[in-house]
Amino acid sequence: MKSSVEQLSDTRVKITVEVPFEELKPELDQAYAALAQQVQIPGFRKGKAPRQLIDARFGRGPVLEQVVNDMLPTRYGQAIEENDIKAIGQPDVEITKIEDNEVVEFTAEVDVRPEITLPDFSAINVEVPAVTVDDAAVDEELESLRARFSTLKDHNHKLKKGEFVTLNLSASVDGEKVEEATTEGLSYEIGSGDLIDGLDEALLGQKKDDTVEFTTELANGDYQGKEAVVTAEITATKQRELPALDDEFAQLASEFDTMEELRESTKTQVETRLKNEQAANIRDEVLKAALESSDFALPNSIVEEQAHSQLHQLLGELAHDDAALNSVLESQGTTREEFEKQNREDAEKAVRTQLFLDVLAETEEPEVSQQELTDHILFTAQSYGMDPNQFIGQLQQSGQIANLFADVRRGKALAQAICRVNVKDSEGNEIDPKDYFGEEEVAEDSNDEAADQE
């Protein structure tokens, strides 16, 4: 077999392959054996008919067609390997010559990974927000915990932001009742803004048993975009009652006996969360700087595939209803054109990041242990809300375990490179990235990096 490569662009090549017939004996034998099973010729057992009779019955064409179909995957793969081509995606194959008993020739155009020059990570400088755990941050966390143990108590004063009401809602457009906007016994927190535009303003200052009326533009449904008259009947009013921050609360809300112990534990939790955020900031800033210093062309077909995949995933969340997507975009003040542009930019970023990390992984050559791969699989299953055993079964069936292995390898490669970067916080303090991305922290960072790519 002979092969040659023509560079069509930075990201696409054309491979020409010539295969002499003497190399196709296994495929010829297999083709005749398959056809022999399809014909019954008097005097011969099934599958034992000689080739001359098969040619007479079917002609030589079906044999050659089967030979070509059988040999294409292996010969294409051989040409890719021999020419050290980093192919991406599926090739466009064309059979250019079939000379019986002489040669088969085909061409394959395929996208390839562009040449990527990695930066000197030791020359990269990044700055991230400083980690400051003050009393205010701890108080905020404790207030959040306190709110989770609050109770709702009836009241009859004028409504304020943050208080709760029970409503009977109805709406009409041009005097016609809007059924989908009619409900009873709806609980709502004033100020949340997650129901109907104008509702919060209408409720403020009202009391139990009051009825308010206001106009608003409906955001969805059959009357989307129409001006509607909304009537809200207030059937109950409640306010949040918070427990005191004392030892009794500490025992109720945690495993601690005293408020002092709970406060100290909360401070540790806040510090851990802020440090995790700082680690993520370091990773993001380093990756951003590295990508900016390593410009390279992107295979258009791969970007298109990524953009299509992103759109398909989003539509899947909307029952593949294109009209529903347009409605969501309109409610967000975004046009379809703006969405498609942003989707394309996101796809380019995703493809650029993965190609860069693939090259980085080949350079850094991190080792991935079975435990690290298992941890990542469990992490991914959890992020999808799936049973781990069921998820692993799906991975094995679809042959996707290698992809998750590559995810971990990319994450570890980036972690190794980050350890050479110069990092300071916003207060000018030097940060040793090994504290976050050293050997012990790499597996967890690999999970985070893989999750960000999905």
From Swiss-Prot:
It holds the Pfam family Trigger_C. The keyword Nuclease does not apply. Residues 427-454 are annotated as: Disordered. It comes from the Bacteria. SUPFAM superfamilies: FKBP-like, Triger factor/SurA peptide-binding domain-like, Trigger factor ribosome-binding domain. It catalyses: [protein]-peptidylproline (omega=180) = [protein]-peptidylproline (omega=0). Keywords: Cell cycle, Cell division, Chaperone, Cytoplasm, Isomerase, Rotamase. Involved in protein export. Acts as a chaperone by maintaining the newly synthesized protein in an open conformation. Functions as a peptidyl-prolyl cis-trans isomerase. This is Trigger factor. It comes from Corynebacterium efficiens (strain DSM 44549 / YS-314 / AJ 12310 / JCM 11189 / NBRC 100395).
